[in-house]
């Protein structure tokens, strides 16, 4: 089990967890030293979201990198996918983002990309962790790294998207966008302006403390309300670092990451093409059944966009994502990208010329009940054997009417209990039964 890294980088409450100035400096120094060992380019890219702690954590990271002799290019406040994009474009050894994504402002963290724009694999994360626990290393002969700021860093990313989709996007509807007071603030607006979109922007005034507060992709009620008030045709909601996207149709009804994947699958020619879709263990069974009925290959990965990416590469597919709104298109990028996904959707809606609600999967989705059970410590997968017989009992009762998923959180001591069934009360009753068993045997 990893010591510092979770399923999406390193994350925690600032000053009261791993996320301290001291640790962040050591992380920068460890990665810098590893870059030297492997003879990678002595150059990295950094960015951040809008949290009040982002500045001092970034400079702690930079000091550790500079001490190891690594040059740093600072993009400032930009969405996470922009850092991945620029890391590849500028041939940097690595890319860092100071962000805690959809978490509250008191949390922060570090996402780390390798030179190919992918998140680090488990083996490389272990190497970094070993280096963190070693000595702090100064580059000999005072050959320390430099620090530079790149103004208007978003421009290269916007131009890349525009050159690919200008011929497809001609959307005439009214759009409301929720930037979660995060990294998409002003950046997403610049992208929409480039395409001439008629939009109203909400939650786009970050003050360092309001990121994700009552807004963004994890608080969809905000965009639903705004779409109705504005009589808009579409709502687009991003999270704090803009790697997630949830949309809302003209009736204020949510379309989550699974629904977005289904839209992209129907119009994959506009999105560069794909010979299959990767979802996750959380993907609603209704979508899996729909893909099979339409002869679209479908694979379930573990939850986490890094695992979606691994299976995209493994099976040679191009499009995948999660219910939570991480959507990856390998025809363009290497990580979940809310801004690029939004433009893909606007291209599709422009070409198809029908209401957004008509793109949704027809019929009722399977009903899901998800309960997060707090634990006293992180649970390992082998610990789940203690409730294996209880899970088996529920699966027998469900038969072919549903399924069960128990999943430890990758970032906190929580076990997620999910039951899916064709009836909501059945799903809820069986989920509550399993929660009681978990509390008896694991808490």
UniProtKB/Swiss-Prot annotation:
Its cofactor is Mg(2+). It catalyses: alpha-D-glucosamine 1-phosphate = D-glucosamine 6-phosphate. The keyword Glycosyltransferase does not apply. Mg(2+) binds at residues 101, 239, 241, 243. It is an enzyme of class 5 (isomerase). GO terms for molecular function: magnesium ion binding; phosphoglucosamine mutase activity; phosphomannomutase activity. Keywords: Isomerase, Magnesium, Metal-binding, Phosphoprotein. Activated by phosphorylation. GO terms for cellular component: cytosol. Catalyzes the conversion of glucosamine-6-phosphate to glucosamine-1-phosphate. Belongs to the phosphohexose mutase family. NCBIfam families: glmM, PRK10887.1. This is Phosphoglucosamine mutase. It comes from Francisella tularensis subsp. tularensis (strain SCHU S4 / Schu 4).
């Amino acid at each position: 089990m990893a010591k510092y890294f979770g399923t999406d980088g390193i994350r925690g409450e600032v000053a009261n967890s791993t996320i301290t100035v001291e640790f962040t400096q050591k992380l920068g120094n460890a990665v810098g030293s590893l870059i030297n060992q492997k003879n990678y380019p002595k150059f990295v890219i950094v960015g951040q979201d809008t949290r009040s702690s982002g500045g001092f954590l970034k400079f702690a990271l930079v000091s550790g990198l500079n001490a190891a002799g690594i040059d740093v290019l600072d993009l400032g406040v930009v969405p996470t996918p922009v850092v991945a994009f620029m890391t590849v474009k500028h041939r940097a050894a690595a890319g860092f983002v100071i962000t805690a994504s959809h978490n509250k402002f008191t949390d922060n963290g570090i996402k780390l990309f390798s030179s190919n724009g992918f998140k680090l694999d488990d083996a490389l994360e272990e190497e970094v962790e070993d280096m963190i626990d070693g000595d702090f290393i100064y580059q000999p002969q005072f050959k320390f790294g430099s620090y530079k700021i790149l103004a208007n860093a978003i421009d290269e990313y916007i131009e890349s998207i525009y050159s690919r989709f200008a011929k497809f996007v001609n959307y005439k509807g009214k759009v409301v966008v929720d930037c979660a007071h995060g990294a998409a603030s002003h950046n997403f607006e610049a992208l929409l302006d480039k395409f001439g979109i008629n939009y109203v922007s909400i939650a786009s005034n970050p003050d360092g403390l309001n990121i994700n507060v009552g807004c963004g992709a994890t608080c969809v009620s905000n965009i639903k309300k705004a779409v109705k008030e504005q009589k808009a045709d579409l709502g687009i909601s991003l999270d704090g670092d803009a790697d997630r996207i949830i949309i809302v149709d003209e009736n204020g009804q949510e379309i989550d990451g699974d629904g977005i994947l289904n839209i992209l699958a129907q119009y994959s020619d506009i999105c560069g093409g794909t010979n299959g879709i990767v979802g996750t263990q959380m993907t609603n069974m209704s979508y899996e059944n729909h893909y099979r009925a339409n002869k679209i290959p479908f694979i379930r990965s573990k939850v986490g966009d890094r695992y979606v990416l691994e299976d995209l590469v493994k099976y040679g597919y191009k499009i995948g994502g999660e219910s939570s709104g991480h959507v990856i298109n390998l025809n363009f990028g290497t990580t979940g990208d809310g801004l690029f996904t939004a433009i893909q959707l606007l291209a599709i809606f422009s070409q198809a010329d029908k209401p957004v609600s008509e793109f949704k999967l027809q019929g009722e989705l399977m009903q899901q009940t998800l309960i997060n059970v707090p634990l006293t410590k992180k649970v390992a997968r082998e610990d789940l054997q203690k409730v294996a017989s209880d899970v088996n009992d529920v699966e027998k009762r469900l038969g072919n009417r549903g399924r069960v998923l128990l999943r430890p959180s990758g970032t906190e001591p929580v076990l997620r209990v999910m039951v899916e069934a064709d009836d909501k009360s059945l799903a809820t009753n069986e989920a509550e039964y399993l929660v009681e068993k978990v509390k008896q045997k694991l808490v």
